[in-house]
Amino acid sequence: MEKEEKKEEWIKQLKENLINPPKIKADITIEEEKKIILEKTAEVYTEHDLWKKLKKSKQTKKPLIIKYGIDPTSSGFHLGHFVFLRQLKKIQDLGHQIIFLIGDFTARIGDPSDKKAARQPLTKAQVEQNMKNYFSIVSRYIKFGEDGKKAKLAYNSRWLSKLNLEKFFPLTSTLTVSQMLERDCFSRRFKDNKPIGVNEFLYPLLQGYDSVALKADVEIGGRDQTFNMLV
């Protein structure tokens, strides 16, 4: 019970920070900006690359495109989602362009990351309902609109549903089966003689293609997404 109370209190504080975030001064340096972006970040690939992108952004006065993707595989948000929302809010306040990507196409495949078994496929209707629930929560804290200072909402079905074999097959040569089997989620299932779907092998390629389609400068995600984000 005490653990649940602490969790609820933490979520309450996160929401308060989202509604009333700390003020960011106007004349912020690149190093200070990088520090804000990397606050509470476990890993970054690479810090020097981020610094170079921030420097170029400041010189050209062109905001970075920051991608945060989420597959609507459930009906609600968990604690980790609110942590990312807080970070995205800070980055938006720094003046960068947030793209909140809804994986309405990939949700029907299922991300295998950190899973001991294949996900149950969702229907299009389930995905659409989950999408509505997600956006109703996110839009309370993140400002959306066509204004460059506001976040944009994107759906990966817009390009992935049009991706034909002629374009997709060359992408498959960038990964090997041995690389995929090095992932914990796959190696455990392979050793336990549990099924691994070919569609699950293809998932990281689709996530990587999302970043290309959005021309993202930076992608934010959980540690379980590291392999997918580096593809």
Regions found by a protein language model. Give the residues of each.
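Short charge-dense sequence patches
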Residues: 27-40, 75-90, 150-158, 178-188
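Divalent-metal (Mg2+/Mn2+/Ca2+)-assisted nucleotide/phosphate chemistry catalytic cores
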Residues: 41, 121-131, 135-231
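Short, well-ordered alpha-helical scaffold segments within catalytic/effector domains
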Residues: 47, 51, 85, 199-202, ...
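N-terminal catalytic cores of NTP/NDP-binding nucleotidyl/phosphoryl-transfer enzymes
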Residues: 50-112, 220-226
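Active-site rim/loop-helix segments in enzyme catalytic domains that contact anionic ligands
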Residues: 89, 100-138
